[in-house]
């Protein structure tokens, strides 16, 4: 079973996303901050991280950059209520981001994107 870490400072978002992914057949590891995400990654590698951008303390941008600096072999998808331009999205994809999901998301869209990324 493939492991996905869901990182968001909003527990309701983590719980909802976890439920959707578990129904889809994935094992989910929750994290509620950027710091917790990096700590858990050291102990338990995952195939994918669904990462909120705007969090108190260490932001999703900071976490993404740390993952790249440490050469951690995992895919990262940003989740955010903020819309980004296609140009900015392409820059992020070129830097190693796997995708970008707008919140609130449709559960089928989320599962389809995750399935495509992890196939």
Where are these regions (language model features)?
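Alpha4 helix (beta4-alpha4-beta5 surface) of REC/receiver domains from two-component response regulators
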Residues: 62, 83-101, 108-112
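Acidic, metal-coordinating helix/loop segments flanking the phosphotransfer/catalytic sites
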Residues: 30-48
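Two-component/phosphorelay signaling modules centered on CheY-like receiver
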Residues: 11-29, 95
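Receiver (REC) domain active-site loop signature in two-component systems and cognate sites
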Residues: 55
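Short amphipathic alpha-helix used as the core "switch/output" element in two-component signaling
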Residues: 39, 61-72
